Amino acid sequence: WISNPKIASKKSPGFLCLLREMTGIGMNENNPWLNLSDGGHIENMGLYELLRRRCKFIVCVDGEADPRSTFEGQLTLVRHAQIDFGVRLEPRLDDIRLDPKSTLSRTHSHLLRIHYPDAGPGKPKAIGLMLYLKLSLTGDETELLKRYRSISPDFPHESTLDQFYTEEQFEAYRQL
């Protein structure tokens, strides 16, 4: 919870804020206290609100642990965007999907179209683009990444529960 910069309040958020959060009743931008969330209860990439704002170009870095290439986060976003906003995304994920034999992908990225519907005055039908980047290995990585993969076979899809990276682990993800 953070104080609303538009409304001066000397009170602490208190129990009422917790009730609002649990019920969803009265959660709006006119309250003296605002609930900030990473959005993980909807989708984990932070794109939902960018689609609501009808951004023309979005860069998405999908950092979820996805060792079986199910693209759960991306496909959850596709579903919610269509249901909630009428926005249609067209991901083609075959080139990013892991080859089961080599455990490598053909590429790290995909450029996909975003189809925004006509949403009334000032919001005509429009096309946007999303550069989707997936944590993956393609076989042309540096020796540091190859070494880290040899000692950590789950890389780059180690559990996101691990919040305490070693220096080597951090550097491997940074280089990827």
Residue ranges and their predicted role:
Residues 1-176:
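Catalytic domains of lipid- and phosphate-ester/thioester hydrolases
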